[in-house]
Amino acid sequence: MTERRALTILFADVSGSTRLFETRGDEAARHLVGSILIALAEVAARHGGRVVKTIGDEIMCTFPGPLHGLLAATDMQRRIKHDAGFQLDNLAIRVGLHHGEALVENGDVFGDAVNTAARMADKTLARRDQ
């Protein structure tokens, strides 16, 4: 059943993962990227978020409101910056979020709000120096 709902959509992408696979090898890089995605999912859950899916080195989450998503995005950046295991490889994340009407169907989310959030993440510059 398809339901229309106002949601905040968040995408977080691991910046530098291509280089990581080249320098660390497939298994080590996949393990590290997986650890980062788990950390991001934990942060999302603390802010009332739900992980919709992971796509390679990216996580897609929904939140009940904009403030939940914004606080999660801030804490995600903080978590990556302050985790020594993630900083060994100078990793960062790019986060994009948008609030709007979305279609929820079989646990997945579709619509313009989703596309806008994905574009925001794509256009964001990863900051490793903050």
Q: Model regions: which residues?
A:
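Catalytic NTP-binding/metal-coordinating core of nucleotidyl cyclase/transferase enzymes
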Residues: 1-71, 79
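Catalytic beta-strand-to-alpha-helix segment of the class III nucleotidyl cyclase homology domain
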Residues: 60-130
